[in-house]
């Protein structure tokens, strides 16, 4: 059985369970262990695919097309294991599975209850996602004490009874607040949080104590005494200035050794080599250049909606020792044709989105970048905005639009995808009446790049795979007309039916590229992504007056 580390949170939400868990996973991976991660989310939605970005933030997409919590993005940025729909489990999915089994008669007429049926299904999902790994980390969303989390906590309590301490570990993340008026850290919230956890039968093995300051040894001893946790296993997690430095901090305090000792993995695990993370932190702390990128979106008041985009831009910068400053621009603010927000920036990125609100602002951002020769990177809706701009203002297709926003458009250059092949080769069909949830073109899809294009130069190969999440697509009826007007179709699906990337000729624009997929989902701090690296480099070149001041790469 795979050893399991269950990560829970207490006192308040948003303490960073996902980052802490992913950081530990990265250390264990660096020790030669095969690691995976699972997120258990207590909400009743089947997945976050139809949830508002203002409430939930980004919907992260895996290779197999699962629409998941943004924490899976953190996981994949810290560990090299590629995750799937098995790694994201919600209350909605659990209940859906149980109800389907009940309807089929799988329970043989039994009364279906939270215990054992719901908890058994939770345990089955955990087992399915973690089989064949050396270690798995399972994060339980929410905060201890939330009624929604109780079935998950009961399920992991049962797992501990079944597997024992040598195959399970409970890691609890709490807050140790600093009270300025008293001038001291307070441990009482942590004590009460552990008391709440123990009341449902779970005794933490490790405490991760979040705080603004370093926790003194005297306070760590106090926490250990009142929570029945070894002092060695009370780990301080002070605020740090570089997120990707967390693996180094946890390694310094020996968290991985606690795991290795409890699971008796010393014969399997090697010494941790965290040199890659040291290089990442060094590149972030000591940049040699700096650029400002305008991100023109429609959810900019809640930047978690673009979490992977922001991180991918920073990754693209750190691969060149360049600090990337993000200027968040509300797309609607551009619709009065006031482009002041786009002055004095080095590049423009237009990310994905849905619906007509703000779309015209994105079109205007594309036009501004095209006419002012500012590096432009369009992603998903950002590509569609670029196509609409080009159709209207270069190809002369007055009224060109997406049918998502105007079904009566005289020139629907972007239209609903009605048919495509999935990753398994099956044909899927959709229409305007299809359910919103889980009905998009989703997951990793291969595409063929056109020789001689900027895209082909950046990737360095002919065929690439990127993750998708969209319903609307470039309308092939206008492909020839737009190409005749100068637009370059830089990539198409493997069956030649779907336009995947567009760009402008380099004699027309120094760097103008847009893609229908979401490359941000494959960017990591250790490797970056070719498109983001190229975009940041082009932005540096613009800032330098057409040529790079420094050619640096880590």
Curated annotation (Swiss-Prot):
GO-annotated cellular components: cytosol
Transmembrane spans: none
Reactions catalysed according to its record: UTP + L-glutamine + ATP + H2O = CTP + L-glutamate + ADP + phosphate + 2 H(+); L-glutamine + H2O = L-glutamate + NH4(+); UTP + NH4(+) + ATP = CTP + ADP + phosphate + 2 H(+)
GO function term, MF aspect, one: glutaminase activity
GO BP annotations listed: 'de novo' CTP biosynthetic process; pyrimidine nucleobase biosynthetic process
Residues given in the record as L-glutamine binding sites: 353, 381-384, 404, 471
Record's keyword terms, sorted: ATP-binding, Glutamine amidotransferase, Ligase, Magnesium, Metal-binding, Nucleotide-binding, Pyrimidine biosynthesis
Regulation of activity: Allosterically activated by GTP, when glutamine is the substrate; GTP has no effect on the reaction when ammonia is the substrate. The allosteric effector GTP functions by stabilizing the protein conformation that binds the tetrahedral intermediate(s) formed during glutamine hydrolysis. Inhibited by the product CTP, via allosteric rather than competitive inhibition.
rRNA-binding listed as a keyword: no
Domain Glutamine amidotransferase type-1: 292-545
Residues the record lists as binding Mg(2+): 71, 139
Keyword RNA-binding recorded: no
Binding-site positions, CTP: 13, 146-148, 186-191, 222
Amino-acid positions noted as binding ATP in the UniProt annotation, renumbered to this chain: 14-19, 71
Similarity section: Belongs to the CTP synthase family.
Note: CTPSs have evolved a hybrid strategy for distinguishing between UTP and CTP. The overlapping regions of the product feedback inhibitory and substrate sites recognize a common feature in both compounds, the triphosphate moiety. To differentiate isosteric substrate and product pyrimidine rings, an additional pocket far from the expected kinase/ligase catalytic site, specifically recognizes the cytosine and ribose portions of the product inhibitor.
Quaternary state and interactors: Homotetramer.
Protein name (Swiss-Prot/TrEMBL): CTP synthase
This protein's encoding gene: pyrG
């Amino acid at each position: 059985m795979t050893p399991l580390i269950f990560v829970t949170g207490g006192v308040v939400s948003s303490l960073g369970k996902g980052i802490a868990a992913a950081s530990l996973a990265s250390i264990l991976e660096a020790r030669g262990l095969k690691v995976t991660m699972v997120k258990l989310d207590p909400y009743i939605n089947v997945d976050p695919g139809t949830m508002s970005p203002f409430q939930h933030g980004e919907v992260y997409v895996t290779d197999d097309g699962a629409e998941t919590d943004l924490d899976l993005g953190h996981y994949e940025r810290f560990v090299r294991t590629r995750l799937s729909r098995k790694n994201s489990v919600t209350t909605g999915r659990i209940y859906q599975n149980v109800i389907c089994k009940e309807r089929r008669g799988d329970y043989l007429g039994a009364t279906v209850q939270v215990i054992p049926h719901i908890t058994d299904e939770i345990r089955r999902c955990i087992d399915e996602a973690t089989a064949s790994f050396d270690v798995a980390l399972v994060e339980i969303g929410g905060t201890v004490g939330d009624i929604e989390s109780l079935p998950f906590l009961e399920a992991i309590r049962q797992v501990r009874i079944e597997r024992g301490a040598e195959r399970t570990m409970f890691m609890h993340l709490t807050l140790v607040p600093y009270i300025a008026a008293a001038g001291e850290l307070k441990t009482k919230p942590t004590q009460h949080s552990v008391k709440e956890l123990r009341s449902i039968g779970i005794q933490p093995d490790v405490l991760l104590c979040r705080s603004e300051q370093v926790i003194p040894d005297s306070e760590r001893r106090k926490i250990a005494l009142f929570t029945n946790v070894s002092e060695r296993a009370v780990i301080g997690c002070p605020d740090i200035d570089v997120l990707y430095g967390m693996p180094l901090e946890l390694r310094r305090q020996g968290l991985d050794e606690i795991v290795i000792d409890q699971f008796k993995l010393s014969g399997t695990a090697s010494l941790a080599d965290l040199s890659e993370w040291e290089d990442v932190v060094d590149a972030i702390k000591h940049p040699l250049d700096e650029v400002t990128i305008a991100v023109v979106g429609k959810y900019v008041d809640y930047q978690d909606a673009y979490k992977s985009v922001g991180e991918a831009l920073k990754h693209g910068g750190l691969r060149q020792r360049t600090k990337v400053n993000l200027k968040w621009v509300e797309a609607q603010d551009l619709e009065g044709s006031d482009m002041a927000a786009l002055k004095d920036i080095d590049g423009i990125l237009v990310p994905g989105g849905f619906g007509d609100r703000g779309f015209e602002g994105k079109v205007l951002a594309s036009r501004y970048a095209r006419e002012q020769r500012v590096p432009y990177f369009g992603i998903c809706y950002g590509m569609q905005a670029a196509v609409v701009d080009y159709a209207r203002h270069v190809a002369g297709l007055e009224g060109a639009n997406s049918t998502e926003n105007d079904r009566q458009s005289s020139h629907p250059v972007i239209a609903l995808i009605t048919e495509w092949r999935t990753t398994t080769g099956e044909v899927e069909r959709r229409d305007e009446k299809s359910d919103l949830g889980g009905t998009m073109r989703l997951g990793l899809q291969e595409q063929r790049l056109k020789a001689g294009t900027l895209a082909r130069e950046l990737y360095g190969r002919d065929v690439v795979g990127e993750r998708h999440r969209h319903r609307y697509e470039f309308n092939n009826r206008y492909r020839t007309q737009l190409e005749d007007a100068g637009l370059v179709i830089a990539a198409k699906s493997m069956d030649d039916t779907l336009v995947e990337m567009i760009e402008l000729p380099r004699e027309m624009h120094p760097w103008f590229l847009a893609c229908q997929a979401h490359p941000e989902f494959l960017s990591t701090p250790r490797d970056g992504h070719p498109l983001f690296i190229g975009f940041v480099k082009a932005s540096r070149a613009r800032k330098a007056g057409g040529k790079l001041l420094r050619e640096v790469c880590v």
